[in-house]
């Protein structure tokens, strides 16, 4: 869930729109400590089917729209699950390994259009075994860098922040748990408009629709 490019099918164009980076907060650093493939993982055939939908099965694709590889990682999603370099430059096996970690964290909602099209469920994720070689993932720590402003600018910023906090205070919020994704949360809380509406309501905090963090607080869209 951020510049890279994806295969230009209707599915990938939609994924590109939902994964656009929105300014709202500055991330000075993000480090995940240890990653592990799930004890149960989807079969290679399942990943081949997903890749066929996402990129016509082209594991080394980079067409310039912010997505890479067979299952169309964004660079931020790839790095969040421990990937190095660019996804399309990694082997198919490495891409599948990182995709398994992302699927374990986010569910099939990390690929909302193609997973629904293919009818993928948790049963597909439990179809094959892989060895866990690293530590379990933990929530990402983030820090914000604030540029110093003049006294007048600071006063205006404080007023804007107070107004934003007042709006957030009136809205219902939820806290991300392990295994959550925008797709699963939208279903759980019956969000009108689905995961895309939940993403739109949290653009300031969620830069990539495929990547949310354990402990992160999200605002539920108001009906």
UniProtKB/Swiss-Prot annotation:
<feature type="domain" description="LysM">
    <location>
        <begin position="172"/>
        <end position="220"/>
    </location>
</feature>
<keyword id="KW-0964">Secreted</keyword>
<dbReference type="GO" id="GO:0016787">
    <property type="term" value="F:hydrolase activity"/>
</dbReference>
<dbReference type="InterPro" id="IPR023346">
    <property type="entry name" value="Lysozyme-like_dom_sf"/>
</dbReference>
<dbReference type="GO" id="GO:0005576">
    <property type="term" value="C:extracellular region"/>
</dbReference>
<dbReference type="GO" id="GO:0009986">
    <property type="term" value="C:cell surface"/>
</dbReference>
<comment type="function">
    <text>Factor that stimulates resuscitation of dormant cells. Has peptidoglycan (PG) hydrolytic activity. Has little to no effect on actively-growing cells. PG fragments could either directly activate the resuscitation pathway of dormant bacteria or serve as a substrate for endogenous Rpf, resulting in low molecular weight products with resuscitation activity. In pM quantities promotes the resuscitation and growth of dormant, nongrowing cells from M.luteus in addition to Mycobacterium tuberculosis, M.avium, M.bovis, M.kansaii and M.smegmatis.</text>
</comment>
<feature type="region of interest" description="Not required for resuscitation activity">
    <location>
        <begin position="119"/>
        <end position="223"/>
    </location>
</feature>
<dbReference type="InterPro" id="IPR052196">
    <property type="entry name" value="Bact_Kbp"/>
</dbReference>
<dbReference type="InterPro" id="IPR036779">
    <property type="entry name" value="LysM_dom_sf"/>
</dbReference>
<dbReference type="Pfam" id="PF06737">
    <property type="entry name" value="Transglycosylas"/>
</dbReference>
<protein>
    <recommendedName>
        <fullName>Resuscitation-promoting factor Rpf</fullName>
        <ecNumber>3.-.-.-</ecNumber>
    </recommendedName>
</protein>
<dbReference type="InterPro" id="IPR018392">
    <property type="entry name" value="LysM_dom"/>
</dbReference>
<dbReference type="Pfam" id="PF01476">
    <property type="entry name" value="LysM"/>
</dbReference>
<comment type="similarity">
    <text>Belongs to the transglycosylase family. Rpf subfamily.</text>
</comment>
<keyword id="KW-0732">Signal</keyword>
<keyword id="KW-0378">Hydrolase</keyword>
<dbReference type="InterPro" id="IPR010618">
    <property type="entry name" value="RPF"/>
</dbReference>
<feature type="signal peptide">
    <location>
        <begin position="1"/>
        <end position="41"/>
    </location>
</feature>
């Amino acid at each position: 869930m951020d510049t890279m490019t994806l295969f230009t099918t209707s599915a990938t164009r939609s994924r590109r729109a939902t994964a656009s980076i929105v300014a709202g907060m500055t991330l000075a650093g993000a480090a995940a400590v240890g990653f592990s493939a799930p004890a149960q993982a989807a079969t290679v055939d399942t990943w081949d089917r997903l890749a066929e939908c996402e990129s016509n099965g082209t594991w080394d694709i980079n067409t310039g729209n912010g997505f890479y590889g067979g299952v169309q990682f964004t660079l931020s999603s790839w790095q969040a699950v421990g990937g190095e370099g660019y996804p399309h430059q990694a082997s198919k096996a490495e891409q599948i390994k990182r995709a398994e970690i992302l699927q374990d964290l986010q569910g099939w909602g990390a690929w909302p259009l193609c997973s629904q099209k293919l009818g993928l469920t948790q049963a597909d994720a439990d179809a094959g075994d892989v060895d866990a070689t690293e530590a379990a993932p933990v929530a990402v720590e983030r820090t914000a860098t604030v540029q110093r402003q003049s006294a007048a600018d600071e006063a205006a910023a404080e007023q804007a922040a107070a107004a934003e906090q007042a709006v957030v205070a009136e809205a219902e919020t939820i806290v991300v748990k392990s295994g959550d994704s925008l797709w699963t949360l939208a279903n759980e809380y019956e969000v009108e408009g689905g995961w895309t509406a939940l993403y739109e309501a949290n653009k300031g905090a969620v830069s990539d629709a495929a990547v949310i963090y354990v402990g992160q607080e999200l605002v539920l869209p108001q009906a």
